[in-house]
Amino acid sequence: MQQHYQFDAIVIGSGPGGEGAAMGLVKQGARVAVIERYNNVGGGCTHWGTIPSKALRHAVSRIIEFNQNPLYNNSRTLSATFPDILRHADNVINQQTRMRQGFYERNQCKLFAGDARFIDANTVSVSYMDGTQDTIRADHIVIACGSRPYNPSSVDFNHPRIYNSDSILELNHEPRHVIIYGAGVIGCEYASIFRGLNVKVDLINTRDRLLAFLDQEMSDSLSYHFWNNGVVIRHNEEFEKIEGTDDGVIVHLKSGKKVKADCLLYANGRTGNTDSLGLENVGLESDSRGLLKVNSMYQTALSHIYAVGDVIGYPSLASAAYDQGRIAAQAIASGEASGHLIEDIPTGIYTIPEISSVGKTEQELTAMKVPYEVGRAQFKHLARAQIAGMNVGSLKILFHRDTLQILGIHCFGERAAEIIHIGQAIMEQKGEGNTIEYFVNTTFNYPTMAEAYRVAALNGLNRLF
C-alpha cells in the first residue's frame, strides 16, 4: 500500500554531498528524508570510487614497499592478484558503510532505499525493487545523486573483458595485460595499481600530456615514473573501434595503430545521474553530460531545489561535495550560507607515488605575469625519507618575489596528499600570515617529511636578490 510522507527536506543520494546536506539539516532541527537508490548508504564514493580505489592502491603500495626495501632482504618476491587485493577493498567498504549507516540512524534521518523521481516541485516518488511506490513531500529538496562512468554507445560494456571504473571492481580473472583508455585521474590511478601488480599496462591518452591541469613539472614527474616502471603511454590517441574477442580486447586507434590486451578499462569521462529524476516534471534541465547549473548557494533554477556534488561538475571531489552539502544545508536553514568553498581547493591524486597540489601552477602564474620564485626540496635529501626508503618525490613552493606570499604548493611522492595540508594551512592565513618565511621561522619535528617545507623555503629564499 502506497504511503505518503511529509518532511522538511528531501535529500536524493547518500554520498558525501548528500551526507553533508542531511547531517547539516538535522543539526538545525529539520526532519530529513534521504533517498538512496541502493540498499547501502555511501554513494559512488564509498562503493565504486574513492574508497575502493584508494584501498586497492594502499594494498599495492605495501606490496611494492616490501619487495623493494632492502631491509627485508627477501629471497622471494611477494605477489598478489587483482582479486586478492579486492578483498582488502571490500573490508574497507563494509567498515565505511556501517559507520555511515550509523550517522543516519543516530541523527534520526529516515532512509528510503529506492529510485527517486520528481512528481512536482515539492513531491518526489520512491520506487522500490518490489514494484511498490511511496511519495514524499518537502519544502526543500537537495539533489546529490552523483555521477557514473560515461559509457559511449559504440563500446560493448556487456562484453566480459570490457570494464568501466565501476565494473572493474568485479574483475575476477588475472589479466597479464590491460589497456586503460583515458588518462585522467581515474585512469592514472588504475595504471599505478595494475602496474604495481606486474600487469602490463597500455595507457591511452586523448590529450598531449598526462593530467594537464597539474603543474607541468608534476605531470612530467608522473610521466617519467610511469615510463620508468614500464607503463606504455600513448598520447593524442582516440579509438576508432573497440573490439571484444574471446580472450581479450583489441583497440583500433584513429591513427591506424592497434593495441591488444586481456581486458580494457574505459575511464574517459563521467555523466551525472539525472536522467531518471524526472527533471522535466519540475522544469529543470541538465546539460549534455547530465549536470545541473547552480548559484553560489547551490540553488538550481528553482530556489527551493538545491544540487551538490558530482551532479554539478567541477571540482568533482568527495571533500568538496561534503562541504557543498553543508553549505546548502545552511542556506536552507537560515536563508543564506555563512560558509563557502575555499578558493584554493587541494587536489589529491592517488597514483603511486601520490600527487597533491593547492593554488596556482607555474604556467598559470607566468601567464598572469606574476613575479614569483620557486623553492624546491627533494625527498631523497630528507632523513625521514631515507629511513623509510621513500626517496622518490619532491615538494615545490611557489611564492611572490616581493611579498613572499605563498601562491601555490605542489608535491609528488609518498604521503603527498597529507603533506600538502601543512602548506595549505599557511596559504589560508590572512594578510601577512601567508608567508614563506613561516617555514624558516618555525620548528619542525626531526626527522619528518614535513621538514621538506623548511628545505624548500630556504631554497627559494636563497634565490632572491
Swiss-Prot record:
Group of enzyme by EC: oxidoreductase
Positions contributing to FAD binding: E36, R37, Y38, N39, N40, V41, G42, G43, G44, C45
Presence of keyword Transmembrane helix: no
Cofactor: FAD
GO cellular component, one term: cytosol
Pfam annotation, one family: Pyr_redox_dim
Coarse class of the protein's main subcellular location: cytoplasm
Designated name of the protein: Soluble pyridine nucleotide transhydrogenase
Organism: Serratia proteamaculans (strain 568)
